[in-house]
């Protein structure tokens, strides 16, 4: 994709608006699909989901143009995500809860506060993952751990995930710690 110098232009603002609009439409259509499915309209649900996927791809076009035609590396994305979550719980939801409470909407204020606490957990998760990526610890831990290939389900026990899955040959990055607390 061609690169453009759009910083500070109306086109940059339009790309941001297009990205936001397509992103919101995608979520809305997935909610509509769930409702249609609950009401027994399988074909309509499928159409909503197909359109939601189209909207996701449209949003990706605008996102890439906003980021010099490329999605940044994982460390950059983790930092961006952590900072976004930080803003949500320290500023956005705190402010929104206060305003809702001032207007007499105590239940909505509670929900803003409760979601804000979840966003704090999200920030902490992203910062831990970033530290793992920066420290090369994503696929290596102290002591034996149970690793599972996210692609085929192969289980490996060791301090480090294998460099490549011996079953499906996916790279080490596909291994994750096996979740066993159901």
Where in this protein do the model-derived segments appear?
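Non-heme di-metal
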Residues: 1-182
